[in-house]
């Protein structure tokens, strides 16, 4: 069975944040601290192996932990950050969370690791109703598949998951875990719920 200590983790903070008015979402304040700090707190309670993927504010993110850009200039979405994480991190298994989900559970890593089987390429969190495509754990052996996927212009992570041996980790006991804060309205709406 895959152990959490055998994994490295990347916080995805490389998006354009259009719905947030172009603000760097990692530095948007939620409950008195930047969203990036919520993500770091979640992971630090479970692992020491954390990096950030960002395409701007690199110096600011680097104050927290190792930070790297992805190699794509056209913002192909979270898959670019996942590719960068798989290439840059040392372990065979690399996990990913978004910077804008401040309510992820403190047993996230163990739940994802427990779902891994011998032939698993990717584990994706599932809340009982929907898959959560950017809360995931991936094996480095899929790098060539991501390369080919992006080279042909595909961007939808779910399509990549169909090309790989993907399994789901059950997070149905955590109904509010995957609230994603994409806009000022969502910050206000969920600020009192979480």
Curated annotation (Swiss-Prot):
Cofactor: Mg(2+)
Keywords: Cytoplasm, GTP-binding, Magnesium, Metal-binding, Molybdenum cofactor biosynthesis, Nucleotide-binding, Transferase
InterPro entries documented for this protein: MobA-like_NTP_Trfase, Molybde_CF_guanTrfase, Nucleotide-diphossugar_trans
MF term (GO), any: molybdenum cofactor guanylyltransferase activity
GO biological processes: bis(molybdopterin guanine dinucleotide)molybdenum biosynthetic process
Protein name: Molybdenum cofactor guanylyltransferase
Principal location: cytoplasm
Organism of origin: Aliivibrio salmonicida (strain LFI1238)
Phylogenetic lineage: Bacteria, Pseudomonadati, Pseudomonadota, Gammaproteobacteria, Vibrionales
Subunit comment: Monomer.
Keyword Magnesium: yes
């Amino acid at each position: 069975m895959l152990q959490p200590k055998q994994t490295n983790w990347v916080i995805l903070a490389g998006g354009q944040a259009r719905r947030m008015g172009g603000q760097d979402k990692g530095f948007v304040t939620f409950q008195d601290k930047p969203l990036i700090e919520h993500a770091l707190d979640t992971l630090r309670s479970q692992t020491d192996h954390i990096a950030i993927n960002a395409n701007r504010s690199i110096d600011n993110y680097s104050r927290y932990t190792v930070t790297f850009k992805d190699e794509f200039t056209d913002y192909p979405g979270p898959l670019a950050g996942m590719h960068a994480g798989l290439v840059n991190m040392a372990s065979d298994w690399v996990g990913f969370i978004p910077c804008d989900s401040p309510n992820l559970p403190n047993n996230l890593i163990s739940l994802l690791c427990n779902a891994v089987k011998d032939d698993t390429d990717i584990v994706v969190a599932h809340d009982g109703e929907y898959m959560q495509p950017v809360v995931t754990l991936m094996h480095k052996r899929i790098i060539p598949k991501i390369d080919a996927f992006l080279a042909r212009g595909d961007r939808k992570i779910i399509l990549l998951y169909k090309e790989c041996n993907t399994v789901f980790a059950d997070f149905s006991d955590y109904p509010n875990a995957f609230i994603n804060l994409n806009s000022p309205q969502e910050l206000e709406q969920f600020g009192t719920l979480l």
